[in-house]
Amino acid sequence: MGVAKEGCMQHIPSIAFSSCNYDENADLTPLHDGVLKVVKMVLEKGLPEYTCLNVNFPALPPFKGFKGCRMTHGSWINEVDHRTHPHGYDYYWMVGEYRNDEPETTDTDQWAVNHGYIAITPTKIDVTDYDWLKNFEL
């Protein structure tokens, strides 16, 4: 999502695509048609200013279709592994697992992917909490 957000801030229609298939030899060919449909939609209809899309594919086809949904509330646990490169320098590798804080909720990207749908989540660059701001006093 980082690169998609950077593009979005430069007023470039941006989409991040991810697969839940983490096999380093995964055949991503089955994602081709879904990627093309989303790209075509964005090129034809555009996106609102400062909005980009996060598109997540289930690990394996067949895909049941597309679901527009919100992000799941949760967090990554055990997410970073400290390693040493063969040339001697330290680096950190993203590993971990995702803890879903709302596993019974059916309007989220996690639910959609777990149930065979391609999840499309529109995200905004502006993360200001306007509800909090309305009541701000010091």
Regions found by a protein language model. Give the residues of each.
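Internal, conserved structured core segments that host functional sites
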Residues: 1-21
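Electrostatically charged, flexible surface regions
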Residues: 28-138
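Structural signature of PLP-dependent enzymes
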Residues: 24-25
